[in-house]
Amino acid sequence: MVAVPAVAQERVTLGWGRLLTNDAIGDGKDRWRTGSYVLSRVRGPNWSGSLPGRPGEILEFRMRLETIAPADLVVANPLDRRYVGALSLGMHTHFETAGVESSIGMDAVIVGPQTGISSLHGDLHDLLGLPDPTVFGGQIADDVFLTLTAEFGRTLPLGANAQVRPFIEAQAGAETLVRVGGDMTFGGFATEALMLRDSATGQRYRAAAGDRVEGLSVMLGGDIAKVYDSEYFLATDAITPTDTRRRLRAGMHWQGAQSEVFYGLTWLGKEFEEQPDEQVLGSINLRLQF
């Protein structure tokens, strides 16, 4: 974990970031990386529109819920992945040195029935009158995985109102991988803002606002990862995890005088060899003030 230096100034809340992701607002097929919600609270002495030059001044406290599921919750298929209910709690610091934007942090990823996610999922099926799931008994068992994540990127301007940001990311813990990719933004969405990244989709979401330029912004991105290990697959299972993962994403953000709306789509490549198809997730964030 990165050592956090003492900061003389009092910390205040600089902003909140959140993103809801579900395949119900993507391809609508309710399977695999089926849903997640991330909530970030960012604290620091102040936000001036740019990252500080050292770690520890700006801290992000992150909570994330994720459901990973086989395609059929009622009839177990040995050639499909196991159910995963994951709750992660962590702290990350964001800073910039020599033009390189850095994010380093640690999360405790809690999995298994102890999270209560599968119970909540079952209750939702009861409420909607759907068949009772039978795959929860074979879900990834109770455990806690300490997960270190580091991302390094550089924002490069493309004219007056666009930017491109190549990045590299390394993660070790619940899943161990190295990822390279990039994001392009057309419009004012990311201008002087503290941008965070959702781990499942790679979609970027805003925590500390910058100029809040009114109008539409368009985001495009993609990345590829080399996967070394994943605690979400068991060696005894009949499926084979892929060692390469690909993602493509696009999003649109509207900023009004007081309100804002974001909607994005993410294409995910296959995560195990027996997976019959890719999937598309939808992500949404609403901040409405009247």
Language model features: what each stretch is:
Residues 8-49, 54-58, 63-75, 223-233:
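Short glycine/proline- and aromatic-enriched beta-strand/turn motifs that initiate or cap beta-hairpins
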Residues 8-13, 45-58, 96-103, 155-164, ...:
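Short loop/turn motifs that connect adjacent beta-strands in outer-membrane beta-barrel proteins
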Residues 13, 25-26, 72, 189-290:
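Outer membrane beta-barrel transmembrane domains
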Residues 14-22, 59-67, 106-112, 166-174, ...:
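Transmembrane beta-barrel strands of outer-membrane/channel proteins
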Residues 24-26, 45-47, 67-73, 112-118, ...:
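Gram-negative outer-membrane beta-barrel proteins
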Residues 31-37, 57, 83-87, 102, ...:
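Residues that define the transmembrane beta-barrel architecture of outer-membrane proteins
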Residues 37-43, 89-95, 108, 148-154, ...:
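Residues on the lipid-exposed face of transmembrane beta-strands in outer-membrane beta-barrel proteins
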Residues 53-119:
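Long, hydrophobic/aromatic-enriched structural stretches that serve as scaffold segments
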